[in-house]
């Protein structure tokens, strides 16, 4: 089972990324730069900092897409253990419950099972990052004025995936030998959102004790 999570971070993934960067684009070059820094062994706090001369929205866009792919893959490796029966409510322990709301099917906050919430979340994020009006890929096309607000909402909801996985499926992480991989992804994500103040501090509370232990 340990091989399963290693495949998540390798070139031969069991679960394919939903979004790729087009070779030859500025976004692709930034992605390569970010990945090279990750593999260089640099401190993750340093890795997330905006490189000199780069556009902050491009940098955020690259990381939002990368985190979406990675977190989607992490959840995918343990999705069979997160069922309507085992997780009838999308929650983070007894104190935190997450309800789903969107502009189509659920206009009011709805209590859903964790797998249903996850499916809606991943589809919602995928639709946003594939929307040229939100995540433009053409040269010279500016980001929308509310781009960072959109990214804040995406990253806040992705953080909730970490909350659910760590609190409700930590045994699965351990049984797959995946703790180090998931922790590294979480630390990378955490340092990034803190560097650019992209997620409200209150949203981070469910994993505060763990974060203090592994990120400080």
Swiss-Prot record:
InterPro entries: MOB_kinase_act_fam, MOB_kinase_act_sf. One of its GO terms (molecular function) is metal ion binding. Zn(2+) binds at residues 82, 87, 164, 169. GO terms for cellular component: cytoplasm; nucleus. GO terms for biological process: signal transduction. Transmembrane segments: none annotated. It comes from the Eukaryota. Keywords: Metal-binding, Zinc. Pfam families: Mob1_phocein. The keyword Transmembrane helix does not apply. PANTHER family: MPS ONE BINDER KINASE ACTIVATOR-LIKE MOB. May regulate the activity of kinases. Belongs to the MOB1/phocein family. This is MOB kinase activator 3C. It comes from Bos taurus.
């Amino acid at each position: 089972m340990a091989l399963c999570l290693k495949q998540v971070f390798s070139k031969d993934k069991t679960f394919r990324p939903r979004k790729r960067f087009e070779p030859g684009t500025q976004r692709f070059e930034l992605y390569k730069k970010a990945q090279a820094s990750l593999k260089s062994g640099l401190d993750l706090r340093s890795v997330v900092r905006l490189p000199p001369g780069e556009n902050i929205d491009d940098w955020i866009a690259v990381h939002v897409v990368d985190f979406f792919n990675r977190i989607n893959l992490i959840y995918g490796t343990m999705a069979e253990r997160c069922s309507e029966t085992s997780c009838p409510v999308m929650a983070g322990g007894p104190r935190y419950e997450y309800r789903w709301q969107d502009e189509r099917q659920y206009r009011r906050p709805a209590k859903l099972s964790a797998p249903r919430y996850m499916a809606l979340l991943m589809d919602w994020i995928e639709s946003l990052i594939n929307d040229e009006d939100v995540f433009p890929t053409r040269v010279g096309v500016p980001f929308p004025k509310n781009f960072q607000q959109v990214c804040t909402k995406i990253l806040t909801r992705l953080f909730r995936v970490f909350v659910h996985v760590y609190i409700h499926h930590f045994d699965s992480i351990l049984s797959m030998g995946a703790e180090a991989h998931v922790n590294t992804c979480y630390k990378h994500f955490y340092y990034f959102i803190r560097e650019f103040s992209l997620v409200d501090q209150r949203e981070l509370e469910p994993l505060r004790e763990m974060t203090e232990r592994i990120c400080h």
